[in-house]
């Protein structure tokens, strides 16, 4: 029976982890030696255990420090080549952007009339005139659009203010009408109260009070 697939995760048991490390390390260094012998390659391996113990291998006849030095020089040269290539690309991009900026500035000066010395033919002037007329037409169209929008906003604002004024007028009218009605009711109540008081006084004095049409008549008893 074949060995089952081992799940690639940290071995929690310390003893099993140490045993596995020893076996895998030996096999790994053996494979490195085979690669160096069979392929005539310079191979260097550095391994630190979880306890910090160093294990290394270097294919003869070089020593590990010589191999590290060669690695450092090679990677440094590679980084320098990549840096130089990036610098060249950056210089090319900067040059392209500068040329584009110069062209845009020259075009802007021509369109504003600040520098027409670069325009040497009638056709170029005619083309520039058409561009300016087109730009001016767009400016007028945008101006008309903004003015129409402002007028519409003012109309809506005026309509809103007018509606608010009408509402306030109706509210004020209702309040005034309610005040008048309230005053009339209070006046009527006061008149009735005074009449009742006068009637009571007359009755106490021995008068008979009879209302005839719109007048009051008193008879002494």
From Swiss-Prot:
The keyword Transcription applies. InterPro entries: MADS-box/MEF2_TF, MEF2-like_N, TF_Kbox, TF_MADSbox, TF_MADSbox_sf. The keyword Zinc does not apply. One of its GO terms (cellular component) is nucleus. GO terms for molecular function: DNA-binding transcription factor activity, RNA polymerase II-specific; protein dimerization activity; RNA polymerase II cis-regulatory region sequence-specific DNA binding. It is found in: Nucleus. GO terms for biological process: positive regulation of transcription by RNA polymerase II; regulation of transcription by RNA polymerase II. PANTHER family: SERUM RESPONSE FACTOR HOMOLOG. This is MADS-box transcription factor 30. The lineage of its organism: Eukaryota, Viridiplantae, Streptophyta, Embryophyta, Tracheophyta. The gene is MADS30.
């Amino acid at each position: 029976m074949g060995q089952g697939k081992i799940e690639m995760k940290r071995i929690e048991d310390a003893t099993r982890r140490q045993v596995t490390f020893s076996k895998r390390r030996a096999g790994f260094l053996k494979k490195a030696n085979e690669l160096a012998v069979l392929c005539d390659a310079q191979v260097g391996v550095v391994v630190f255990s979880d306890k910090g113990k160093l294990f290394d291998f270097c294919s003869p006849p070089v020593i590990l420090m010589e191999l590290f030095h060669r690695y450092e020089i090679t990677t440094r040269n590679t980084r320098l080549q990549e840096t130089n290539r990036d610098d060249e690309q950056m210089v090319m991009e900067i040059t392209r952007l500068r040329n584009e900026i110069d062209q845009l500035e020259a075009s802007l000066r021509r369109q504003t009339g600040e520098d027409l010395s670069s325009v040497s033919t009638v056709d170029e002037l005619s083309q520039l005139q058409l561009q300016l007329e087109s730009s001016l037409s767009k400016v007028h169209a945008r101006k008309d659009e903004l003015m129409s929008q402002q007028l519409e906003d003012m109309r809506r604002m005026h309509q809103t203010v007018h509606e608010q004024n009408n509402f306030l007028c109706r509210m004020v009218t209702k309040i005034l009408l309610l005040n008048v009605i309230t005053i009339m009711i209070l006046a009527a109540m006061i008149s009735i109260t005074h009449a009742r008081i006068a009637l009571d006084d007359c009755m106490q004095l021995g008068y008979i009070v009879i209302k005839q049409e719109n007048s009051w008549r008193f008879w002494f008893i």
